[in-house]
């Protein structure tokens, strides 16, 4: 994760301001259209997109509200959701599935005869964290028949991009898709546009991303967005490091105590092994609790956000 200095030449794509300016405004929809077509090259080609209201309400007043980063519609009426997620959340996959239900449900024709035919819905998620230690950085997800291994329903698609895993070298032979991913990941760290990004669309990208060309209001908005991004990241890293240290210390102590207890009852060898196993488990749990306590003390995140970041329940965070 880059923590770009606010005086660098180009904006940090991971900030809320930059992401929505470059991918979520009518003036820059050619940038998003180019990226989308690079994602689906060989399977789909979009001629135009129309931006839609990013705030969606449930069918009833009591249902939860969904706020998308970018929400648009193709010339065929297909819906596309684009999200930038900087922090790991316990139920992020669930949330992305939940969000995709809104474009589905809004297609229902109220008060009319309807045959249930649906337009395609695409969800694209940029992740500034990783799901696991697997080397694959991209995950294309559809409804699949587990018996045959074939796609059962192809109108609902999810593309998850684990950006920390993306380390493909940039060359002149790189695909447009790879060039876009490189630009998105490294934009805030660059002083010049790389020669490999020679396509005209990247001229547009770097023009729109150059901080010096912003109005005073835009520059202030960006710097505030960058500050929030840096504060959040710094707070999270500090809490994680402190929590890990405290968790390891408590885990070792509990492991030794449990090992001695089990050793007396069932023999030293088995007791030590069991003690180490339980101690590691307790240590990991205590590490998460310690991180939660540190995040609560910082006052920068809500209980719900802390729970998502630490894989704890909100009740556990409250009691931490």
Q: What spans do the regions from the language model cover?
A:
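Elongated, amphipathic alpha-helical interaction scaffolds
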Residues: 1-320
């Amino acid at each position: 994760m880059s923590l770009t200095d606010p005086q660098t030449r180009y904006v940090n794509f991971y900030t809320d301001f930059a992401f929505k300016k470059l991918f979520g405004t009518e003036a820059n929809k050619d940038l998003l259209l180019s990226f989308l077509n690079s994602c689906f090259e060989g399977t789909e080609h979009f001629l135009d997109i129309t931006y839609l209201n990013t705030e969606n309400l449930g069918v009833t007043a009591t249902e939860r509200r969904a706020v998308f980063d970018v929400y648009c519609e193709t010339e065929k009426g297909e819906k596309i959701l684009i999200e930038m997620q900087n922090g790991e959340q316990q139920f992020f996959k669930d949330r992305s599935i939940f969000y995709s239900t809104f474009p589905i449900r809004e297609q229902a024709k109220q008060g009319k005869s309807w045959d249930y035919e649906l337009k395609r819905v695409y969800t694209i998620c940029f992740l500034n964290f990783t799901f696991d230690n697997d080397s694959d950085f991209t995950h294309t997800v559809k409804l699949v028949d587990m018996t045959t291994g074939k796609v059962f329903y192809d109108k609902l698609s999810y593309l998850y991009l684990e950006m920390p895993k993306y380390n493909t070298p940039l060359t002149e032979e790189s695909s447009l898709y790879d060039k876009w991913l490189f630009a998105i990941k490294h934009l805030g760290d660059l002083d010049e546009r790389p020669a490999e990004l020679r396509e005209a669309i990247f001229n547009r990208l770097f023009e729109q991303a150059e901080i010096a060309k912003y109005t005073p209001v835009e520059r202030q908005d960006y710097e505030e967005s960058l500050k929030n991004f840096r504060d959040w990241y710094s707070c999270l890293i500090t809490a994680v490091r402190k929590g890990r240290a405290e968790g390891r210390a408590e885990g070792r102590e509990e492991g030794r105590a449990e090992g001695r207890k089990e050793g007396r009852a069932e023999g030293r060898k088995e007791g030590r092994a069991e003690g180490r196993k339980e101690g590691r488990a307790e240590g990991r749990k205590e590490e998460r609790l310690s991180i939660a306590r540190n995040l609560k003390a910082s006052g920068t995140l809500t209980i719900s956000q802390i729970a998502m970041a630490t894989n704890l329940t909100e009740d556990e965070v409250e009691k931490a």
